[in-house]
Swiss-Prot record:
Zn(2+) binds at residues 146, 149, 159, 162. Belongs to the class-I aminoacyl-tRNA synthetase family. MetG type 1 subfamily. Is required not only for elongation of protein synthesis but also for the initiation of all mRNA translation through initiator tRNA(fMet) aminoacylation. Its EC number is 6.1.1.10. It catalyses: tRNA(Met) + L-methionine + ATP = L-methionyl-tRNA(Met) + AMP + diphosphate. Keywords: Aminoacyl-tRNA synthetase, ATP-binding, Cytoplasm, Ligase, Metal-binding, Nucleotide-binding, Protein biosynthesis, RNA-binding, tRNA-binding, Zinc. The keyword Protein biosynthesis applies. This is Methionine--tRNA ligase. It comes from Yersinia enterocolitica serotype O:8 / biotype 1B (strain NCTC 13174 / 8081). Residues 573-675 form the tRNA-binding domain. The gene is metG. It is found in: Cytoplasm. Its cofactor is Zn(2+).
Amino acid sequence: MAQVAKKILVTCALPYANGSIHLGHMLEHIQADIWVRFQRMRGNQVHFICADDAHGTPIMLKAQQLGIEPEQMIAEMSQEHQQDFAGFAISYDNYHSTHSDENRELSSLIYSRLKANGYIKNRTISQLYDPEKGMFLPDRFVKGTCPKCKSPDQYGDNCEVCGATYSPTELIDPKSAVSGATPVMRESEHFFFDLPAFSDMLQAWTRSGALQEQVANKMQEWFESGLQQWDISRDAPYFGFEIPDAPGKYFYVWLDAPIGYMGAFKNLCDKRGDLDFDEFWRKDSEADLYHFIGKDIVYFHSLFWPAMLEGSNFRKPTNLFVHGYVTVNGAKMSKSRGTFIKAGTYLKHLDADCLRYYYAAKLSSRIDDIDLNLEDFVQRVNADIVNKVVNLASRNAGFINKRFAGKLADHLADPALYKTFTDAATSIADAYSNRESSKAIREIMALADIANRYVDEQAPWVVAKEEGRDADLQAICSMGINLFRVLMTYLKPVLPALTERTEAFLNTELTWDSIEQPLLGHQINAFKALFNRIDVDKVNEMVASSKEDMAAAVAVTGPLADDPIQETISFDDFAKVDMRIALIQQADFVEGSDKLLKLKLDLGGETRQVFSGIRSAYPDPKVLEGRLTVMVANLAPRKMRFGISEGMVMAAGPGGKDIFLLSPDNGAQPGMQVK
């Protein structure tokens, strides 16, 4: 009896729309795509969707920095993301955005149902507020000194030096990462999702046996420490969806982000017309729903998301498929080393199938980190795909094309060997189905070794020279081609581009069920190179290009872009400049000038008068009095209509309000020379 086709909805975590896709992201999308392609080969009805996560403070602020509207920025980023995923042959049925009408409607619907069911609580909270920008600050937008280890320049939620976690209000000398201002405490009414109300349901889901053991164990730790109500609101200004009947309040990005899965599918349903949204999302849905995610967002997907769905009368996920991080050459991806590689940069230098294969050869169903060792990457791809698989076709196709006009023999030379290959279909299918692609690859490569050993032993290049053995030659080479066909059928979920070229060469589609019948008396096409070896130089160029990419990115966003470093001077030229520490004794407005301040500077025994164009940044000049600064002391006096300026104080910044007077470190005294 034929197996009934399953209806499956598969998602990947939504990439954030404020940055490019890199090879760390690609692990998840490749893993999911391999699984989806396998399920489709097995006859299941799979809908594969994703979207850009397009809301939140970081996107709002980055758009401001770029001088464009957030809508323009996320549209441009979506185009780049989709181009990268297409380059890696990720077979999405729909790629959407959380900033969509569908997502707005569904977010409002879910919120309204949660509120009607008593799961939304209101309470007033105190949080840090940036008085210059007029906005409440997320934890990651507050920086200061760690209250535990006293390390400076740490985020408002955890210390990257000692690992401590804390509230942003505990930071020593906190500053807004947006404006540099000292934040103040302000109260605001926020809306909370009552997550603890779903504790029993979530614990039962955890114990159901569906989740990965590592995920279930981690969830148990969270249950033991106690679930907390979840703040789902943010105050204006915020780029996102305004909460119904709550002017100036917006849904927190992590509320509408997972709803983006639903929004992307709803958009697909509306486009197609033959899909029923409710069939996949209603409470009693019999369809399967799987989320591929990284281990860093398990908390949201294993607790908040199923609870939100339960509380709003939608179905829960069938399962979460969680993976680890990507390291490169045994270390965290590094911009300085060129191992922080963007997907687009990779595609300019290498074939997407190479990375797909390497990740597949390392992935399992466990939440283990994957190391992309670039040397091993080159060796494994060349050894496995080129030397073992593609070489099997090239060793045999030449004889078939030249001696037999491209026609395969009408019988198998070794039916028992062929059956060994087709019998492996069950265990390889089980491996793919269970997301054990590394196990599948090991089995496939073991078969490839057997196939090549068969060709070595039969030695068609010797048979070709012997009189009267044409039939043997055709049978041997046809056997090799048929074994190649089986191998490529098993590799089809992993290597879509190579599969397409292989199908053109073999003049047949590769399907899982068709391998039971070998190609007999079949016409193949002329053999053309199916796959190129990885050139180490190309990998090195990619790494070098990644360094250049990051250098360019820094230049674009940093002050150097607008104010490049000037021509090199000699040390003797620099030595002529005499810079000294100066104490600002007095600072006053200059009558008749809206740009200048008049400063009286003490150099430790000598007093100077200096006119400085810093008034726009210091509207109250008295705040400068008593402060140490740096001045050029041997600059020739300059006669101005307001008086004589006897030097120059040092400041940084582009101008206007963004002028920053330089100050020396503690211990410096007036008159000291700066060297």
